Amino acid sequence: MQAKAVAKQVRIAPRKARLVIDLIRGKQVGEAIAILKHTPKAASPIIEKVLNSAIANAEHNYEMEPNNLVISEAFVDEGVTLKRFRPRAMGRASRINKRTSHITIVVTEKKEG
């Protein structure tokens, strides 16, 4: 059985979020939370919140044991891009892309043995 949690339209660039997601993929949830707490990146608390949601979903919806959970899938997709403009010299303007992310974490119970 697997439980999933998704955070959509999170205001962080997917490239930056992927750096953190790559650290926890395939790890046990306790170890992953410890890694996230000690990673000095802006994406860490956001991903930790999604991971805690996935653990709660597994516990509540599927009666899984939180101590036996492993992160089987963890990925970041691109969300919508908010376009903004920065004024420049001589009446010009430059476009700023404020990127958003869709963060998905899937947890499964560890196989015995």
From Swiss-Prot:
GO terms for biological process: translation. InterPro entries: Ribosomal_uL22 (IPR001063), Ribosomal_uL22_bac/chlpt-type (IPR005727), Ribosomal_uL22_bac/org-type (IPR047867), Ribosomal_uL22_CS (IPR018260), Ribosomal_uL22_sf (IPR036394). The keyword Cell membrane does not apply. Signal peptide: none annotated. CDD domains: Ribosomal_L22 (cd00336). GO terms for molecular function: rRNA binding; structural constituent of ribosome. Keywords: Ribonucleoprotein, Ribosomal protein, RNA-binding, rRNA-binding. GO terms for cellular component: cytosolic large ribosomal subunit. It comes from the Bacteria. Pfam families: Ribosomal_L22. Belongs to the universal ribosomal protein uL22 family. Part of the 50S ribosomal subunit. NCBIfam families: rplV_bact. This protein binds specifically to 23S rRNA; its binding is stimulated by other ribosomal proteins, e.g. L4, L17, and L20. It is important during the early stages of 50S assembly. It makes multiple contacts with different domains of the 23S rRNA in the assembled 50S subunit and ribosome. This is Large ribosomal subunit protein uL22. It comes from Halalkalibacterium halodurans (strain ATCC BAA-125 / DSM 18197 / FERM 7344 / JCM 9153 / C-125) (Bacillus halodurans).
